[in-house]
């Protein structure tokens, strides 16, 4: 089989490595991929949002199955376009990807169908948003409606911070069109849990839970990032909570999308907060999370391609989705200065042992064929072990085998989860 994977980050590298465990997969093409995954896939310099070229490539190369991993091409209709040429795909069509593409849509969906989430108001003009903030409870959460590279959510601790966030989105247009509408919602407290799930639009099969580490600095300080590391499973996510989420959140979401004529297939990511009043949805993503994928997929014991095809064929109910009962930890190595500004082009070296456990994100091959840094988050190194403590220790040991100038990592990935276990 010839498989096409759209995207070029660590998440895509993890998906590709897992797909290649299936003996029937002969070639995986990554569009655009990156220099660090060139040994695992044929990287083709076509951008992830260049849908016309992606479709042309898929047709010319007689692709048997496509996986569209990032949010942008999904929201832009990459699956619709590939399906239109008879190519089966993993991922939702554009009318379902809106569940991530528009925060206003997803909040209104939850309200309409009684899915637990934070109280909220939607604003289309800055003046009414600022007026509302004069009396709104603080802290509060300001969200840009559209996609904003994971940076479109501001937790404002003061009224002034909230007002500045609204102005930057609606007047300064820091997120462009994505900030034309905004959501202002109540600040929830409690442990956060990421649950990715496979769905064919009828059945939901959750993957193992995980815990992300969003802030750039140790002890959850500094700016929000795309994620500096993850552990799985998440110790806060008990079997009782899992049952409650399936009954009150996971299935109702899929049923709500069906009722709206927006059947969702692929990977639906539930960002949850376990509040004193029960689990609530903070966000939906219409795709695998990054770096959650780098701990979740290594623990998947079932064949990934088989499960993906079941979401496409509507046969997920009778397809086994089994996970290991071990623990995983992924440590991200980033460029110093991320997520603001950082230098690129530093050579990356990896020991053979580290390389086998590392997913490459922000890297490319230079003119001489040497792997150099090209982004904020450069690599993610994952270890699996019987206990969480061992997985964390091993992930850091393996991560020591990845080096480049001005590399930065958090030193406390998984420590919050360890405290929860004690």
Segments the model singles out, each with a brief description of its role:
Residues 90-151:
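A conserved helix-loop-beta module that forms one wall/lid of the active-site cleft
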Residues 1-94:
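ATP-binding N-terminal substructure of ATP-dependent carboxylate-amine bond-forming enzymes
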Residues 43-49, 121-125, 156:
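Short acidic-hydrophobic, aromatic-tinged amphipathic segments that line or gate anion-handling sites
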Residues 152, 156-293:
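Internal nucleotide-binding/catalytic subdomain
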Residues 344-380:
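Generic long, charged, amphipathic alpha-helical segments
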